[in-house]
Every structure is written in C-alpha cells, then in structure tokens.
From Swiss-Prot:
This is Uncharacterized protein YfmB. It comes from Bacillus subtilis (strain 168). SUPFAM superfamilies: YfmB-like. It comes from the Bacteria. It holds the Pfam family DUF3212. InterPro entries: DUF3212, YfmB_sf.
Length: 122
C-alpha cells in the first residue's frame, strides 16, 4: 500500500539528506539516527521521524491530509534554505531521484518549494 506519494517521498528525502549534509558540515562526521533527530529538532524544528516515515512509506493516510504533509515538507525545505548551497541541494535531489527511481521508475518529481528559491541565494 502506498501511504505517501512518490513526490512526498522525494521532498522528504531531500529534507533528510540536507539535514545530514548540514550536520556533517558542522560536526565533521556522519550522524547516528538519534543524533540526527536531536540535531534536526533543536536547530530546525524538523521532526525527522515524520520525514523518515514518509521516505519509508510507513504511516496511515488518514493521519494527515495531503495538503498538510506537503505544507509541512515545504516549511522544512524553506527552513533549511539559509544553510544550503547549490551543490548540497543538487546532491540531495540526485540522491532522492536515485532512491525513488528504483521504486517508481524515472518519473519527474517537483519540489514543494521552487528550485528558484534555492538558486537565488547562490
């Protein structure tokens, strides 16, 4: 059963990957799951468990409406914007696409915020 859309999974993957990259950049090492969850919550108010549940398609579709999920992911992406470089963003998009292409083929996915929002800051 598909609880979350591939596009929601794509955006969640990017959020997760960007948080990992920011953590690595600041700490100089890769985080464990607990460290990542604490870092995401303390620094960005991101519920990484929620993000992981979308990526892994674990959940109950009745729990949240599509618009609520997309709004939350959009907010997370916007929160990360000041801390992300174009290279970090492109790496995360490529990683997300590679992950999803194994499950859903080579579909095109859209961000819940515009690519331009990330590119303008460069």
């Amino acid at each position: 059963m598909q609880y979350f859309s591939p596009e929601q999974q794509y955006n969640a993957w990017i959020v997760s990957d960007l948080v990992k990259q920011i953590f690595h950049k600041r700490a100089g090492c890769s985080p464990g799951i607990h460290e990542l969850a604490v870092f995401a919550e303390e620094h960005f108010h991101i519920d990484i468990d929620f993000v992981f549940s979308i990526i892994m398609n674990i959940g109950d579709i009745e729990f949240a409406l599509t618009d609520e999920i997309e709004k939350k992911l959009s907010g997370y992406l916007s929160t990360l914007l000041p801390y992300v470089t174009a290279d970090m963003f492109e790496t995360s998009k490529a990683n997300a696409h590679a992950f999803l292409s194994r499950r859903h083929g080579n579909a095109a996915y859209h961000l819940f915020v515009s690519d331009d929002a990330f590119m303008r800051k460069q």
